[in-house]
């Protein structure tokens, strides 16, 4: 009997210990659930190794400063990330500029909003014939992209370069909006993918990075770089969320983790002047 009582005491002691241990572990998920609440999924498009390195740094900063786990979801085309955001499949996306977002919201009756600026990829006026914009002669031919948004952007670049003046108040400028052309420039409209190729046939051409990079255009070919001002604000790339979630603290913390000196340094390291941080421009 004595041995039986001892054995029973041992069994109950073990049971009691297991109950206490189980109770202790039951509090563990409370901390974990809080950590899960600090997870955010960011949608990007066709991320390059340079982009990945920048986002890795941002994720490390977000984790260190705010305890946020940043997950990156890569999409293959520009039609997917806004739909995924609107459907709740991701929390934020980072692939578009203000002009693209405005057009998407209008076409899709959307209410997505910018929560932070990232960078701008300035377009440039290139020439194979001249080294200085002041050397462009009277009657010179300047090529610009012929699609509405890129042509407008090119015309605003020519305006900021002092080559033409434009009618004020138009978000999208056209050749018809030119009010002054002191050098009597001939504006040649070509497909955006031809702007780099026609450089041998024109005096200068406005080319964006998509086509300047594969054409191996360099700073020595550059006459003028698009400035970051009120005319180019719509081309700044942004972090985007749904209107309902725009004021969430975690999103503002992600923006802060992105907009750092370290991120600026990485842009300079990987992109030089091709992509420029733009969060201090307003």
What do these predicted ranges mean?
Residues 25, 148-173, 255-282:
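Ligand-binding clefts/hinges and TM-proximal coupling segments of bilobed small-molecule sensing domains
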Residues 39-71, 80:
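Short, polar/charged alpha-helical segment
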Residues 47, 76-78, 88-102, 191-192, ...:
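Beta->alpha turn/N-cap motifs
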Residues 72-83, 170-197:
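Short helix-initiation/N-cap motifs at beta->coil->alpha
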Residues 115-164, 264:
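A conserved helix-loop-strand patch within extracytoplasmic ligand-binding domains
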Residues 122-133, 235-248:
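A bilobed periplasmic-binding-protein/Venus flytrap-type ligand-binding module shared by bacterial periplasmic
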């Amino acid at each position: 009997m004595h041995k039986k009582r001892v054995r029973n005491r041992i069994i109950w002691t073990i049971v009691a210990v297991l109950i206490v241990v189980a109770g202790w572990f039951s509090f563990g998920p409370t901390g974990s659930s809080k950590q899960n609440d600090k997870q955010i999924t960011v949608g990007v498009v066709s991320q390059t190794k340079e982009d990945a390195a920048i986002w890795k740094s941002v994720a490390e900063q977000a984790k260190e400063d705010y305890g946020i786990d940043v997950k990156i979801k890569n999409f293959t085309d520009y039609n997917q990330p806004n739909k995924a955001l609107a459907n709740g499949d991701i929390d934020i996306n980072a692939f578009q500029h203000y002009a693209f977002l405005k057009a998407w919201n209008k076409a899709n009756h959307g209410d997505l909003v910018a929560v932070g600026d990232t960078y701008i990829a300035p377009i440039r006026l290139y020439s194979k014939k001249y080294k200085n914009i002041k050397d462009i002669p009277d009657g010179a031919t300047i090529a610009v992209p012929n699609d509405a948004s890129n042509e407008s952007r090119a015309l605003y670049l020519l305006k900021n370069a002092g080559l033409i003046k434009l009618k004020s108040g138009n978000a999208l400028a056209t050749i018809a909006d030119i009010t002054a052309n002191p050098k009597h420039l001939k504006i040649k409209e070509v497909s955006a993918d031809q702007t780099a190729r026609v450089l041998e046939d024109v005096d200068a051409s406005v080319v964006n990075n998509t086509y300047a990079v594969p054409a191996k255009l360099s700073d020595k070919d550059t006459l003028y770089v698009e400035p970051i001002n009120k005319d180019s604000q719509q081309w700044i790339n942004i972090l985007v969320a749904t209107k309902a979630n725009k004021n969430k603290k975690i999103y503002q913390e992600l923006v802060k983790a992105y907009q750092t000196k370290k991120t600026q340094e990485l842009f300079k390291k990987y992109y030089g002047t091709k992509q420029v941080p733009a969060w201090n421009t307003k």
